[in-house]
From Swiss-Prot:
This is Respiratory nitrate reductase beta chain. It comes from the Bacteria. Induction: Induced by anaerobiosis, there is no significant expression in an aerobic environment. Expression is further induced in the presence of nitrate or nitrite. Its main location: membrane. Coiled coil: none annotated. It is found in: Cell membrane; Cytoplasm. It catalyses: nitrate + a quinol = a quinone + nitrite + H2O.
Length: 266
């Protein structure tokens, strides 16, 4: 299982609250410029593999990537965060998420055996989008639940994955979570412009094409093109516009005592 975060950049107003709370809450280095990005806590982090001293490691129970302060390793990313793991362990969201209106936290179940296959695609655009989705598992699938229990994943983590806003909305990719620059409209007047979404799928525009009309009449043509139902679109609206606290943050308390010490495995 992996704890994941989603940022809705449409709601970012540059208020600096995320950086201020990180500075005050973690007493950690911070930067003057608003940077709505953070350590990705990757499923297969390259920094862990390249650190010569083995000081960087990925936690087994929640997938958070940390640096062992008793060892020496220069982080390749100046924005390295610890994902507020003491708060995550107690079932609380990160401080930046709790003070930001556009952040969502939740649990994802994934198949670690598929990571190498997804990363080994010969060409960047060859099913990159589909391969990424194949890594993540449906938490409502009985077979997935059965296998997760066999792997020692606690029931409360499985329950959290089933209610996870990250699984429901972030995957597959939606333009509402775009990482492209805002402030410009394409020639067709659609925001975001399809051309701006190419970065989400290595240049392949097919998977990220979306359209929306607001005319007081339900137009399902765009939904049919992307394989969404009207109910799913309504659910997206609920999460993106009027979500409650418990909808945005679904973080199970940690079972760290049951987790394998991944530093020993490494």
């Amino acid at each position: 299982s992996q704890v994941g975060m989603v940022l809705n950049l449409d709601k970012c107003i540059g208020c600096h609250t995320c950086s201020v709370t990180c500075k005050e809450g973690m007493e950690y280095a911070w930067f003057n410029n608003v940077e709505s990005k953070l350590c990705e806590h990757c499923l297969n982090p390259a920094c862990v593999a390249t650190c010569p001293s083995g000081a960087i490691y990925k936690r087994e129970e929640d997938g958070i990537v940390l640096i062992d302060q008793d060892k020496l390793c220069i982080s390749g990313c100046p924005y390295k965060c610890i994902f507020c793991y003491p708060r995550i362990e107690s079932g609380q969201p990160t401080v930046c998420s709790e003070t930001c209106v556009g952040r969502y936290l939740g649990v994802l179940l994934y198949d670690a055996d598929r990571i190498e296959e997804a990363a080994s695609t010969e060409h960047e655009t060859d099913l990159l989008y589909e391969r990424q989705l194949d890594v993540f598992l449906d938490p409502n699938d009985p077979k997935v639940i059965e296998q997760a229990i066999k792997q020692g994943i606690p029931q409360n983590v499985i329950d959290a994955a089933q209610r996870s806003p990250v699984y429901k909305l972030a995957l597959p990719l939606h333009p509402e979570y775009r990482a492209a620059d805002a402030g410009e409209l394409g020639s067709n007047g659609i925001l975001p412009d399809v051309e701006s979404l190419r970065m989400l799928s290595a240049g392949d525009t097919g998977p990220v094409i979306r359209s929306q009309t607001v005319e007081g009449v339900t137009d399902t043509r765009a939904l049919e093109e992307v394989g969404l139902t009207e109910a799913q679109a309504q659910e997206m609206y609920r999460y993106l516009a009027i979500a409650n606290y418990e909808d945005r943050f679904v973080v199970p308390s940690s079972h760290r005592i049951d987790a394998i010490n991944i530093t020993e495995v490494r």
